[in-house]
Amino acid sequence: VIVGFPGETYEEFKDTLSLIKEVEFTSLFTFIYSPREGTKAASMEDPVTKDEKSRWFKELCDLQESIASKRTSKMKDNIYKVLVESESKNHPGMLSGRTEGNIIIEFSGDSSLIGSFRNVKVTEPLNWILKGELQQ
């Protein structure tokens, strides 16, 4: 979702927020519009200030964070089939994988599990990732 495209009004932005509330995406890729030389949009009039775009962006991110938190909290204590992708980049000794719903889950396990599907129980739902426990 691009926030603050030239000509976008606050009313149009609120329509975007309404759609996001209705759909409740698992995740969003969001950006503040920035002009790119050579594009038509770069030469368009842009009455929205950078500060306004930043406020809109924060509003969008806060909304998505609350949606993500609501969704992941419902996953606690459930077991999911997970594709084990790699060792965790941020947590040594942990593996990282994805549920069938594309949600990242980290759990303890041997690196030999990478590339396989495993059942993992969600022990701690966070906004953007899950912590879990490998099931036998």
Per-region residue spans from a language model:
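Conserved C-terminal portion of the radical SAM core fold
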Residues: 1-39, 59-68
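Terminal RNA-binding accessory module
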Residues: 43-136
